[in-house]
C-alpha cells in the first residue's frame, strides 16, 4: 500500500488508530471529528441524518468556482432535494434502469472494440464508456467515435474540481475574507484560477443543456432526463435552472466515480490472476464461449457478482466523505458543537480488520458461502440523506440480505464491463526485457480518487474471442 505522504485518508486512519473511532481535534480553528468505523458512521449519519447532511463550507470550490450548486457540494436544502427527486425519478427503480440495459450493452461493446484496437489507451476508453452511458441518460447525447468533446469536458472539469477542493491548498479556504481581494493584487492568483474553473463548469452545465434544447426544437431529441422535463408543460425558469444543474450532477458525478472503479478493475485483475481465472471459468461454464455475457446472465454468475462487490470495497472512489453539523449534539458523552466538521474515513471502514478478514487481500470469496462478510453498502454509496440517488436502481429490494444487492446505475454498467472484459480478454502484467512489470496500487486525487496510470497487457483470449468482440459490436449497432 502507498505511504501516508499526501494521502489524507491514510493520515486520518493513523489519527484514528491513536485516538479511536470517534476522534476529536481541530482543523482551521473548527471543531473536527474523524470517524473510523461503520458503527459510529451509522449511529450519526444514518440515525441522526437530519443533523449530519450538510457539507463544510468550501470558499474556493463551492463559492468562487461555483461548484456549490452541484449535489456533491450542495448543502441539504430544497435545491438538493429537488435534484435528488429528478435523478431518482430517472434511475430510481429496477424498471427505470432496466430500460437502459440495451444502451449500456451497446456502449460496453463499443468500448471492448476500442480496447481491442488500441489497448494502450485503456484509461481513455474506460472514461469514455461510462461518460457515454451517463450522457445518454442525462441529456440524450450520443458520443462520437474517437475523442468526444463532452467526454473531454467532463474529464477537465473533474480534474479542476479535485484541485479546487483539495484541503489546505488555497489560503482562501483558511481565511474566507480573502475572497474579496481584487484579482490583480499580488497573492490573489486563486481568484484568477477560480475564474478559469468557473468558466469550465459553466460549459459543463450549459453546453449539453443547450444541445438538448436544440434537439427538441428540431424534433430529434432522444429520451433523457433533460428532454423529459424540458418537454413537460408549465416549465418555469426556476425549474429549468434546477434541471440544468441536476443533469450536470449526473454527467459529472456519475461518470467520474464509475470511471474510477472500472479502471481499477484492470489493475485488480493484473495483480490477482487467480481471481481472473476463476471468474473466467465461471463464465465459460455458465454461458460458454460462443457469446458475451448480458444482464440476463447476472443471477447465474455469483462469483462475478462477488468480484464486483470486492472491487468496490478494494477501490472505493471516495475514500473520505465530509459533513457539517447543523445543531449541537452529543455522542457517547462527547459534546459535538454546531458547525463541526465531520470526516468519515470510508477507506478505513472498508479495510477494518474487525469486519473483513485480511482486508488488504482482493478476495471475492469473502462475500460468498454460508457466512459472508458484510457487503460495502453505505460505505460505498453514502450515508443518510446524502446517499447516492441511484443507489437502489438495480434491485427491487433495499435489504442487504438479498443475494443481488441494489447499487447505483454505475454498478450495473460496472458489472457488465467486468463480465464482458473477462469473457473477451486475458488481462496480465506487461513484460519488458523478459521481466514482468508489476504495477502499484497508487490512489491520486482528493474528493474522487483514481488509480495512477499503469501499463497493462490486454489480449483476446483467442482468435474466436477477437471475432466475437467485433461481431457483437456490429450486431448491436
Specify the residue positions occupied by each region the protein language model found.
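Conserved cytochrome P450 K-helix E-x-x-R motif and the immediately C-terminal K′/meander segment
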Residues: 2-20, 203, 291-332, 353, ...
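Classical protein tyrosine phosphatase
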Residues: 34-44, 53, 140-145, 149, ...
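Cytochrome P450 heme-binding "Cys pocket" and the immediately downstream C-terminal segment
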Residues: 53, 144, 273-275, 393-402, ...
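N-terminal membrane-proximal hinge/A-helix region immediately C-terminal to the signal-anchor transmembrane segment
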Residues: 1-65, 82, 105-110, 338, ...
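Central I-helix of cytochrome P450 enzymes
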Residues: 130, 197-209, 232-284, 311, ...
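Conserved cytochrome P450 K-helix/beta-meander segment immediately N-terminal to the heme-binding cysteine loop
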Residues: 344-371, 473-474
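C-terminal helix/juxtamembrane-tail motif
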Residues: 451-477
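Cytochrome P450 heme-thiolate monooxygenase catalytic core
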Residues: 56-64, 98-262, 278
Amino acid at each position: 500500500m502507498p505511504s501516508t505522504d499526501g494521502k489524507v485518508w491514510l493520515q486520518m486512519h493513523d489519527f484514528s488508530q491513536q485516538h479511536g473511532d470517534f476522534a476529536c481535534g481541530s482543523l482551521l480553528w473548527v471543531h473536527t471529528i474523524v470517524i473510523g468505523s461503520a458503527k459510529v458512521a451509522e449511529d450519526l449519519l444514518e440515525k441522526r441524518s437530519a443533523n449530519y447532511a450538510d457539507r463544510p463550507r468550501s470558499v474556493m470550490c463551492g463559492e468562487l468556482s461555483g461548484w456549490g450548486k452541484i449535489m456533491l457540494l450542495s448543502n441539504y436544502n430544497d435545491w438538493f432535494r429537488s435534484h435528488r427527486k429528478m435523478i431518482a425519478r430517472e434511475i430510481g427503480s429496477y424498471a427505470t434502469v432496466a430500460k437502459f440495459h440495451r444502451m449500456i450493452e451497446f456502449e460496453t461493446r463499443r468500448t471492448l472494440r476500442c480496447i481491442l484496437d488500441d489497448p494502450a489507451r485503456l484509461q481513455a476508453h474506460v472514461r469514455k464508456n461510462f461518460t457515454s452511458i451517463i450522457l445518454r441518460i442525462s441529456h440524450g447525447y450520443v458520443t462520437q467515435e474517437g475523442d468526444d468533446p463532452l467526454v473531454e469536458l467532463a474529464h477537465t472539469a473533474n480534474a479542476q474540481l479535485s484541485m479546487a477542493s483539495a484541503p489546505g491548498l488555497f489560503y482562501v479556504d483558511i481565511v474566507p475574507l480573502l475572497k474579496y481581494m481584487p484579482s490583480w493584487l499580488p497573492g490573489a492568483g486563486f481568484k484568477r484560477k477560480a475564474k478559469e474553473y468557473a468558466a469550465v463548469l459553466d460549459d459543463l452545465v450549459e453546453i449539453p443543456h443547450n444541445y438538448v434544447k436544440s434537439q427538441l426544437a428540431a424534433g430529434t431529441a432522444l429520451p433523457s432526463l433533460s428532454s423529459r422535463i424540458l418537454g413537460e408543460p408549465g416549465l418555469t425558469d426556476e425549474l429549468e435552472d434546477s434541471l440544468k444543474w441536476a443533469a450536470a450532477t449526473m454527467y459529472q458525478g456519475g461518470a467520474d466515480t464509475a470511471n474510477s472503479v472500472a479502471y481499477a478493475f484492470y489493475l485488480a485483475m493484473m495483480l490477482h490472476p487467480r481471481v481472473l481465472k476463476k471468474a473466467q471459468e465461471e463464465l465459460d461454464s455458465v454461458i460458454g464461449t460462443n457469446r458475451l455475457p448480458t444482464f440476463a446472465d447476472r443471477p447465474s454468475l455469483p462469483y462475478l457478482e462477488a468480484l464486483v462487490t470486492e472491487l468496490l470495497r478494494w477501490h472505493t472512489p471516495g475514500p473520505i466523505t465530509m459533513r457539517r453539523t447543523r445543531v449541537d449534539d452529543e455522542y457517547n458523552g462527547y459534546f459535538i458543537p454546531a458547525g463541526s466538521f465531520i470526516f468519515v474515513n470510508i477507506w478505513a471502514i472498508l479495510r477494518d480488520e474487525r469486519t473483513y478478514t485480511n482486508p488488504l487481500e482482493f478476495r471475492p470469496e469473502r462475500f460468498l458461502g454460508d457466512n459472508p462478510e458484510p457487503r460495502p453498502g453505505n460505505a460505498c454509496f453514502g450515508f443518510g440523506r446524502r446517499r447516492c440517488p441511484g443507489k437502489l436502481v438495480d434491485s427491487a429490494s433495499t435489504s442487504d440480505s438479498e443475494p443481488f444487492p441494489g447499487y447505483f446505475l454505475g454498478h450495473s454498467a460496472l458489472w457488465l464491463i467486468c463480465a464482458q472484459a473477462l469473457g473477451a480478454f486475458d488481462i496480465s502484467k506487461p513484460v519488458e526485457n523478459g521481466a514482468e512489470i508489476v504495477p502499484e496500487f497508487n490512489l491520486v486525487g482528493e474528493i474522487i480518487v483514481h488509480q495512477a496510470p499503469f501499463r497493462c497487457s490486454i489480449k483476446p483470449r483467442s482468435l474466436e474471442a477477437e471475432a466475437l468482440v467485433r461481431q457483437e459490436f456490429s450486431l448491436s449497432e
